[in-house]
Curated annotation (Swiss-Prot):
Pfam families: vMSA (PF00695)
Biotechnology: Systematic vaccination of individuals at risk of exposure to the virus has been the main method of controlling the morbidity and mortality associated with hepatitis B. The first hepatitis B vaccine was manufactured by the purification and inactivation of HBsAg obtained from the plasma of chronic hepatitis B virus carriers. The vaccine is now produced by recombinant DNA techniques and expression of the S isoform in yeast cells. The pre-S region do not seem to induce strong enough antigenic response.
One Gene Ontology cellular component: membrane
Chain ranges passing through the membrane: 171-191, 243-263, 338-358, 365-387
Protein name as annotated: Large envelope protein
Alphabetic keyword roster: Acetylation, Caveolin-mediated endocytosis of virus by host, Fusion of virus membrane with host endosomal membrane, Fusion of virus membrane with host membrane, Glycoprotein, Host-virus interaction, Lipoprotein, Membrane, Myristate, Transmembrane, Transmembrane helix, Viral attachment to host cell, Viral envelope protein, Viral penetration into host cytoplasm, Virion, Virus endocytosis by host, Virus entry into host cell
GN (gene name): S
Job of this protein: The large envelope protein exists in two topological conformations, one which is termed 'external' or Le-HBsAg and the other 'internal' or Li-HBsAg. In its external conformation the protein attaches the virus to cell receptors and thereby initiating infection. This interaction determines the species specificity and liver tropism. This attachment induces virion internalization predominantly through caveolin-mediated endocytosis. The large envelope protein also assures fusion between virion membrane and endosomal membrane. The middle envelope protein plays an important role in the budding of the virion. It is involved in the induction of budding in a nucleocapsid independent way. In this process the majority of envelope proteins bud to form subviral lipoprotein particles of 22 nm of diameter that do not contain a nucleocapsid.
Region (Pre-S1): 2-108
Alphabetical GO biological process terms: caveolin-mediated endocytosis of virus by host cell; fusion of virus membrane with host endosome membrane; virion attachment to host cell
Keyword Nucleotide-binding among record annotations: no
Record note on quaternary structure: Interacts (via its myristoylated pre-S1 region) with the host SLC10A1/NTCP; this interaction is essential for viral entry.
Glycan-carrying positions: 309
Residues covered by region (Pre-S2): 109-163
């Protein structure tokens, strides 16, 4: 540093530049802060603490001398406040005066006492400001309900938002039906598999059922006769067994439904009187409403004259049941009436044609089943959508 006795203080370690180079107490050297050739560091004017912190000085004096700053005595120099002129410039400025109402809201000046009085005569406005029976002119007039007045005023803005709870409850029913339908379908499909396993086990009493088609020219692995692949010769026999099982299950369901409807009196089949012809006159059941009407009951087998007796035409229960199902389906699905000519033509075919159809189903049935099997779960979905929508 040469002859410059001013020591720079970049880190603020030395207190206020009161360091004596010769470590002489009470030296006559001038205050180094008054030296015009000193280094002006940012922390040069800050008052520091003693060598060992405030309030702790060794008995023989500190390393920095006996000056007050070296002994850890802090002196605070009051700072003069800024002038009053700059105090307003740095702080919040005063709020200016508000302009008059006639300049900011000219439309409010149009509401004079006459216009306001005429507006209050509107019953919708009166219902908002005056209670029932109240009046500004002293006349007691009936006042509409406030809710109805508000709704009438707001009716021009558009329809209210639909209630989402009603929409959610309307969709919950079909979703539950679809879930129950899929669950029932999975359980129903396990019934034919169980019956097929029982059927094939009759040919292998005490042995493990094995498909006999694996010994043919087709190189396939050993498998059960209830799980034949399409290339196995026993695949068509498996389809035939399952088709017969499905027909038996359907027949049992129809018989159960027929017994239930007959027990409830929904199939009024007129019995034959012994020793009479196909038609008889006598007491008969009351004729029910046909399926084309408001009820789902089938047509009665007899006509009822005015004298209380009716002419009964005996028909079998199965025919009455089939007629009932056809009329119910025709009422629900109007397009079934277009199939009547085709069904009549199909029924009138010769036995040769029927055998040909059975043979085609036997030959092409497995291939069609592989094509249509992915779409089978969609049938209950379409049925539920048709019924509920």
């Amino acid at each position: 540093m040469g002859t410059n006795l001013s020591v720079p203080n970049p880190l603020g370690f030395f207190p206020d530049h009161q360091l004596d180079p010769a470590f002489k107490a009470n030296s006559d050297n001038p205050d180094w802060d008054l030296n015009p050739h000193k280094d002006n560091w940012p922390d040069s004017n800050k008052v520091g603490v003693g060598a060992f912190g405030p309030g702790f000085t060794p008995p023989h004096g500190g390393l920095l001398g006996w000056s007050p700053q070296a002994q850890g005595i802090l002196t605070t120099v009051p700072t003069a406040p800024p002038p009053a002129s700059t105090n307003r410039q740095l702080g919040r400025k005063p709020t200016p005066l508000s302009p008059p109402l006639r300049d900011t809201h000219p439309q409010a000046m149009q509401w004079n006492s006459t216009t306001f009085h005429q507006t209050l005569q509107d019953p919708r406005v009166r219902a908002l400001y005056f209670p029932a029976g109240g009046s500004s002119s002293g006349t007691v007039n009936p006042v509409q309900n406030t809710a109805s007045s508000i709704s009438s005023i707001l009716s021009t803005t558009g329809d209210p938002v639909p209630n989402m709870e009603n929409i959610a409850s309307g969709l919950l029913g079909p979703l539950l039906v679809l879930q129950a339908g899929f669950f029932s379908l999975t359980k129903i499909l396990t019934i034919p598999l169980s019956l097929d396993s029982w059927w094939t086990s009759l040919n292998f009493l005490g042995e493990t059922p094995v498909c006999l088609g694996q010994n043919s020219q087709s190189q396939i692995s050993s498998h059960s006769p209830t799980c034949c692949p399409p290339i196995c010769p026993g695949y068509r026999w498996m389809c035939l067994r399952r088709f017969i099982i499905f027909l038996c299950i359907l027949l049992l369901c129809l018989i159960f439904l027929l017994v239930l409807l007959d027990y409830q009196g929904m199939l009024p089949v007129c019995p034959l009187i012994p020793g009479s012809s196909t038609t008889s006159t006598g007491p008969c059941k009351t004729c029910t409403t046909p399926a084309q009407g408001t009820s789902m009951f089938p047509s009665c087998c007899c006509t009822k004259p005015t004298d209380g007796n009716c002419t009964c035409i005996p028909i079998p229960s199965s025919w009455a049941f089939a007629k009932y199902l056809w009329e119910w389906a025709s009422v629900r699905f109007s397009w079934l009436s277009l199939l009547v000519p085709f069904v009549q033509w199909f029924v009138g075919l010769s036995p040769t044609v029927w055998l040909s159809v059975i043979w085609m189903m036997w030959f092409w049935g497995p291939s069609l089943y592989n094509i249509l099997s992915p779409f089978m779960p969609l049938l209950p979905i379409f049925f539920c959508l048709w019924v509920y929508i």
